[in-house]
Every structure is written in C-alpha cells, then in structure tokens.
UniProtKB/Swiss-Prot annotation:
This is ATP synthase subunit alpha. Belongs to the ATPase alpha/beta chains family. It catalyses: ATP + H2O + 4 H(+)(in) = ADP + phosphate + 5 H(+)(out). Disulfide bonds: none annotated. It is an enzyme of class 7 (translocase).
Amino acid sequence: MKNSINASEVVNIIKEKVETFDNPIKRENIGEVISVTDGITLVYGLEKAKFGEKVSFASGVEGIVLDLDHDTAGIVVLGNDRDVKEGDVVKCSGDVVQVPVGHELLGRVVNALGDPIDDGGEIRAKNKMYIESKAPGIIDRKSVHEPLQTGIKIIDLLIPIGRGQRELIIGDRQIGKTTIAIDTIINQKKINDEVNENQKIYCVYVAIGQKISTVAKVVNKLKESGALEYTTVVVASASDCAPMQFLAPYTGCTIGEFFRDNGMHCLVVYDDLSKHAVAYRQMSLLLRRPPGREAYPGDIFYVHSRLLERAAKMSDEKGQGSLTALPIIETQAGDVSAYVPTNVISITDGQIFLESELFHKGFRPAVNIGLSVSRVGSAAQLKSVKKVAGSIKLSLAQYRELEDFAKFGSDLDATVQLSLNKGKYLIELLKQKQYSPMQIEEQVLLMYIFSNLYGQLNKVQVSNINRFECDLINYFQTVHPGVLKKLSGDMNDDIKDDILGIVSDFVTQFNCV
C-alpha cells in the first residue's frame, strides 16, 4: 500500500517554499500610450511620474515627462515618434536626464543627450551630471574681474568681456554673429598654450536648429585652427526633433559646469536661442499650454533665465572657476523689441549688436558701438587696454555724427576736418578679417599709435592701413618681441619712448616701399 501524505505535511512544505522564496516582486510605474502627435505622446497611467522624469517606450525610444494631469501625462519623444504606437507600454526610469561630462568630451561632437555623433568611438566619461541644476547662489559667486579675450579689436577694446559674464550677440541673419563666437574660441588657442591647466579656457559650442552642413564647416574650422582639442561641440540640427533642440543648450551648459565647479574656466556659446525658443514654443503648443505674446508660452523667460543664470564667476571658497556664456539671438530686420530678444537682453550682462547696414558698407565685424554695451566687463580690462581705449569710443561716436553732418556742407573748419580724417583711420584700424583673432598686446599697440602717435599714422594713406597694420605687427613680433610682450601689462614712459622710436623708423621704411 502506498504511503499517503497528510495535510499537515503539505502545509509545512508550502510554508517552507514561501519562506525561502527569494525572487521579490519588482514594482514598476507603467502606463499606456493613448495618442501620438508630432513628437508628443499622451500616456494614461504613470501615476507616480515626476516632472522632467525620463521614460522609455516599448520600442526603446526615450522621452521626458513635461506635462502632468490627473490621470494622464504629456511626454515629449527624444527621437523618431514613428517608433511609438498607440497601446505601447511606457515605463518610468525614476531619474531625470543625465549627460556625461569631463575632459573625455573635449575634441568630440555629441548630440543633446551627450552621445557621440562623430567617428571618435564611444565616450568613456568617468562622471555624469544632471542637465537641470540650480544656478550658484549669491554667496557662492564673485564679481567678474578676469578678462576673457575674444581676439576681436572692437570687442576687447570697447565692449570687454570678463570670465563669468553673459554677453549677448544679437543681429540679423548672415552678418557675422557665429563668426564672432568662433573667433573667440579660436583665440583661446594661443592663451591656452601659455598657461597652466587651471587657467585654460575650455569651450563648448552648442548648435541649435542649424543645417548639418553649416555645423560641419564650423567643426572643420575648429579642427584646422587646433581649437577642437579644447572644445566640445553639442549638435541638435534642424533635422532633429524639437525636444532635442530644446535640451541641447542645457546639455552644453552642464558640460561647461563640470569645469566651472572644478576650479577651471569654460566658455559656452549658444547658437542660437531664437531657434531654441521656437522649439519650446512648438512643444508647448502641442502640449496644449495657453499661448502668450507671439504664441510663446508664459514661461519662455524662465526657460532662458534658468539657463543663463548658471554662468558665473565662482568665489575663492568654491574653487575660483568660471562659466562664461555667449548666447546668440537672431533678429528680424533689426527689430530688437521683439519678445525673445528683449527677454534675453534683460537677462544678460550686455549685448553686442550687429547691424546689416554696417556689414554691407564693408565695416566688419559690423558692431554698432552705440547700441552695444558690456555692463560688467570694464572691471576685467587690463590697465594698458583701459588707457588706450578710453578715447576710442568717443572718437568713433564723433566721427559717425560728423560724417552725417559733412554731407550737408562743403566748408568745414580744421578741427572738424581733423576729426573726420582721424575717424577714417580708426574705422580702418577696427576692421578685421574673419577667423583672424588678434592678441591683446597687438591691439594695444595699434590703438596707442592711433591715440598718441596720430602724426606718424597720418603719413600712411588710409587705403594702405590694413597692409600697414599687418606689416607693423610682424615687425614687432620678429624684431621687438620684448616690447610687444610688455604691452599686456601696465604701460610706462620707457615703453612709450621705445614705441615712438620704433614706429617712426617703421613708417619711414613703409612709405619707401
């Protein structure tokens, strides 16, 4: 007869199995896609989703929660929305977007999520940071006092920029806004070669909504000039979806913050925030948020202010690092009173205004000195620059005024004629070719000659000023490099006497050629 198992034995076996069961239930916050429209998905469920949380769809595509309702969530898709279908399961990650940061990203081209899109292989960064972080507080900051040299004469002399400043570059399309930013990045090459690690300026160039061919030209130019080795390029091109264009500047800022928070210096260029605002407007309207002025949502100011406020010069206790921001805004027919331009002007510490009329006249970079200002940069100017630049702005303003006045009358007194003649020389001296930044001591030399040795400069014809400028700087670099080097410090009488003698001899030789 077979042995029978009684009920108590069965109960004991079940109890033992239950107690030794080591596969705990995994709880997941999931939802279901209700609708997909132009990169925006409406998801039912996700009860514990957080604003800004990263989610993943069944196809592997990721998204970000940007709208929360009673029982639904609005999610922007970070990729192709064709891979997302109604009824798909959506899972919350429990985390917000992070991007890789560190020296490993230098020389690389990445997308808005920090993934490489060049041919350099995988980025093995040791650190990651959240793309959304609080701006440094008042106590953690220090006033701007160190110069950031752009290599552009009209900016370094008249609209100086300091490390930790936010300086807006604004103007119509195709008049040199990006060129100023790229020149500034290229100019750091010589400076970085001469200083230690903590004094180097690392750069981040963020391309938002631009053609891929345009970005490729910029990357090639940086590579040719040797500037890509200390630069990271973040790209969200015109072919990328609106959410990627929206995230790109925050990613670029986060990459720059790594250097700032570790006692180093970084320059971030946002090219441009007009397209960034358009991408955010598109997302907001699709999320059915109420439109405001020019159909932008009510929080468009906050979107830009929370980005630009992260640029700062840190205090001694926080490592003395800095993050400098050069946002770019494109205007329509020179209208700076539009919604987004006025917002960004009010957020930043000054603006460099480029004018189409000056550009077409051949005055390049086409900076309108009357409308351009740097509110904190003067505190960071070198003493020698302050001495020579003091009268330049006044001379330029007088020339512009007298130029219009001279059109109405032919009889001009000697003083007016002298101011007009000096203005013509100054205009030629302030012109600069694309991708040819100039060191600060060379700028000081040229402006000192204009301000104090006009009698010598006047011997050169206006049409020959550009050739005179190039030959003079080459002469100083090869024959008198010591004198040129001293001009980056304070200027004393001995240096002035040396310059007078050298320039007098050079002008004589130049006119004989």
